[in-house]
Amino acid sequence: MVKIIGLDPGISKTGWAIISLNEKNNIEFLGGGTISTDGKLGTGERLHIIFEQLKKVISLYSPNEAAVEKIFVNKNPKSSLTLGYARGVVILALKITKLTMNEYDANYVKKSITGNGHADKDQIIFMVKQIVKNLNIKCHHAADALAVAICHAYTKGSCFVE
């Protein structure tokens, strides 16, 4: 059985989701959530929280593969820089836990899930609920991470759209 962790990095909220694929390539949602940090904390403390919490998630679920959403350059350079810090911590956690990272552009993820590279958050949540039955997910960060994991399954040929 293949287990994939999908990640949507962010300094305030890092979304994560774990899926498994059985021998028939059916997707099962194993867990997901958001690692949140307090904006009142210093950057170093926030990054440490992301790192430690992500290591716990990886240890708990033992995924075989990892998929991370690439960052885009924002109009606000400071926001782009702090997003890059969060992404760096995610990459480090994956490296330390010996998971190979696969990266996907946000537009590619959206297109593979919804058919539209410019889909909004509600469309993504709607489609992941169509793909993964009996899913109760409300947070868009976790839904984005789930979309990244599903995109990876589709892209790597582990699974195909029916």
UniProtKB/Swiss-Prot annotation:
Task: State what this protein does.
Answer: The RuvA-RuvB-RuvC complex processes Holliday junction (HJ) DNA during genetic recombination and DNA repair. Endonuclease that resolves HJ intermediates. Cleaves cruciform DNA by making single-stranded nicks across the HJ at symmetrical positions within the homologous arms, yielding a 5'-phosphate and a 3'-hydroxyl group; requires a central core of homology in the junction. The consensus cleavage sequence is 5'-(A/T)TT(C/G)-3'. Cleavage occurs on the 3'-side of the TT dinucleotide at the point of strand exchange.
Annotated protein name in UniProt: Crossover junction endodeoxyribonuclease RuvC
- Catalysed reactions, as listed in the record: Endonucleolytic cleavage at a junction such as a reciprocal single-stranded crossover between two homologous DNA duplexes (Holliday junction)
Query: How is the cofactor bound, as the UniProt entry phrases it?
Result: Binds 2 Mg(2+) ion per subunit.
Q: Name one GO biological process term.
A: DNA recombination
Q: Which gene encodes it?
A: ruvC
The entry's active site is: 8, 69, 141
Where does the protein principally reside?
A: cytoplasm
The UniProt annotation places Mg(2+) 1 binding at 8, 141
